[in-house]
């Protein structure tokens, strides 16, 4: 009987561990100069509509060390929402280009939304790229799904009025990024 209880406890513990999604809902953190948002939430959840140029960008919230923010709070600014993953080589290669654009354009806000990776994976990745814009966890993929993201990287350029100006699929070179930014200014 004692062995049966131990066996049951072991099976239960392993099952609970295997079913865990690996995410932690810890406090927002900063790795180097990179703010990391361990929690995000889709606000605009209309399932029948994918994000397309000319329409309002689907709203979402994210929590950083200085509080919870929403995409819609950034109206009046030029915003780039970039969907990426740490295993995606083109995503990694374009990060310095995005960071350089943010540093040279004070009114540009970049939100890098990670598709389906844990906060721990993002925290381990952050020092490798050393960007100054937030890396946002989209652990369940709801934000990316709402934006209709299939391939990575996918980048949305959002006008100051909150509408999507451009959807770009694939890595951005410095030249292509400058062209896209010129389209939305």
Stretch-by-stretch model annotation:
Residues 124-132, 138-184:
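Thiol/disulfide oxidoreductase modules built on the thioredoxin-like
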Residues 75-77, 107, 131-132, 149:
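Active-site acidic short loop of glycosyltransferases
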Residues 80-81, 110:
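Hydrophobic beta-strand anchors of alpha/beta hydrolase catalytic cores
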Residues 1-58:
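N-terminal targeting signals for export/organelle localization
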Residues 92-129, 139-146:
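Structural microenvironment flanking redox-active thiols in thiol-disulfide oxidoreductases
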């Amino acid at each position: 009987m004692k062995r049966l209880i131990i066996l049951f406890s072991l099976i239960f513990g392993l099952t609970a561990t295997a079913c865990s999604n690996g995410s932690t809902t810890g406090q927002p953190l900063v790795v180097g100069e990179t703010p990391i948002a361990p929690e995000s939430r889709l606000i605009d959840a209309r399932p029948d509509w994918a994000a397309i140029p000319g329409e309002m960008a689907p709203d979402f919230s994210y929590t950083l060390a200085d509080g919870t923010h929403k995409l819609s709070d950034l109206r009046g600014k030029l915003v780039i929402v970039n969907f990426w993953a740490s295993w995606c080589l083109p995503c990694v290669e374009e990060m310095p280009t995005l960071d350089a654009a943010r540093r040279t354009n004070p009114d540009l806000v970049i939100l890098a939304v990670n598709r389906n990776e844990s906060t721990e994976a993002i925290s381990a990745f952050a020092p490798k790229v050393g960007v100054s814009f937030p890396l946002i966890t989209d652990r369940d993929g709801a934000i990316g799904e709402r934006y209709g993201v299939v391939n990575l990287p996918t980048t949305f350029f959002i006008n100051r009025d909150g509408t999507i100006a451009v959807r770009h699929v694939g890595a951005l070179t410095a030249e292509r990024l400058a062209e896209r930014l010129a389209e939305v200014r």
